[in-house]
Amino acid sequence: RPDDPVLVGSDYLATPETLSSDIGVKTFDEIDATYAAITGVDRVAYQVQVQGQTVFPVDETYQELRQSLPAIESAEAFLSSHQVAIAQLAIQYCDAAVEDNTIWPGLDFNTAKGTFFSGGNRDAFVEPLIQRAVGHSSSSTPILSQPSYVDVHGEVASFPAVGNRPENLIDRLVAGTSNTRAISKGVCASVLGSAATLVQ
């Protein structure tokens, strides 16, 4: 039997420059699976009729953007072009979710925006969206590696304007000229395209 190899010690010390990150970003297929899980939209099956033609807008967008989405999990390799592609895919998934009304069966997106986003209606819209994105609800224990429901809800639906801080996203959008469907899609896309769904 041969002798065991001699182990050689090293004086190598890891530095911040040589350590790899404990976090990364999801790759293109993970982003797609996450968006499908949050919105309830089946990318391949979702279809609409446009001028008598059947089109598959979510799948077409994904196939078009696939090479522009992150291919590796390294946060250092994340580019601004990745964020643009992520935003486009998030908007397409949210468009399908609102039009198909997959996770908000009790809500009517034809309601006037002032009524739709008032009081309890606002929470009926954001609660399932945020809960699916961060993995817990306003009344359950948060996942320590995720932003809290309260933080995401504040940014999207409840923070008032204070000092230099702007109002929450919904209030800013309701004050503009967009209708309920457009606002809902924008809010949905802001949650989907955020670090809450992309960082792992």
Predicted regions and their residues:
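Composition-driven recognition of low-complexity segments enriched
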Residues: 1-200
